[in-house]
A protein has these predicted regions:
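Cell-envelope and extracellular/periplasmic
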Residues: 8-10, 22-23, 47-49, 128-130
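Short, solvent-exposed mixed-charge patches
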Residues: 170-172
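Intrinsically disordered, low-complexity acidic/polar segments
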Residues: 27, 49, 132-136
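Residue-level recognition of well-ordered beta-strand positions that form the cores
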Residues: 2, 17-21, 39-41, 124-128
Length: 172
């Protein structure tokens, strides 16, 4: 993982890289996107009523769509708000499902893959974390181009209110 401040104060770039190896036998990465993959999770004390998600498509269906190039989220913690964007790398497996709808401010990508014993899979994601609202679409696309080496097409960004799943309760 590599952390680097961005040019503007109050922003942080996190590049996440991991490699999975099928050591004991064949490995199938297939579960639900709620409980697998690479996620950002805000602290438990988040104000669930103020969580919003941003998608780079005109009519997002977050429970069904695959392979978003990125997803963004705004959340509030105490009196402060934060924005987070997760950018997917084109080298990651296609068919990636996203969990990006929970009101407790947790979202992320879950790629599906099958590995034979001894094979490896490398996954790369870039997170853009900001104080206040998420960064501009122009900055997201510039970061996406730098991270992936591919100039993205213009997008229509759609904001969706988080679904009211409620903040998970601590187990007794």
């Amino acid at each position: 993982m590599e952390l680097s401040p961005m040019a503007t104060p109050g922003f942080l770039r996190v590049d996440f890289l991991t490699t999975v190896k099928a050591e004991a036998g064949d490995l199938q990465l297939e579960a639900d996107p709620e409980h697998g993959g690479v996620h950002y999770r805000a602290p438990q004390e988040v104000d669930a009523s103020k969580t919003d998600y941003f998608f780079p498509v005109a009519k997002p269906l977050p429970h069904k769509d695959l392979d978003y190039p990125w997803v963004g989220m705004n959340y509030t913690l105490g009196e402060k708000s934060y924005g987070v964007v997760q950018i997917d790398a084109p080298t990651n497996p296609r068919g990636t499902r996203w969990s990006a709808y929970r009101d407790y401010a947790r979202f992320g990508a879950y790629p599906r893959a099958a590995l034979k014993k001894g094979e490896t899979l490398s996954l790369k994601y870039r997170f853009l974390i900001s104080q206040g609202a998420i960064v501009s679409t122009e900055l997201i696309q510039a970061e996406q181009a730098t991270f992936t080496g591919v100039k993205p097409e213009p997008v229509t960004v759609t904001k969706l209110k988080a679904e009211g799943a409620g903040t998970p309760k601590a187990k007794k």
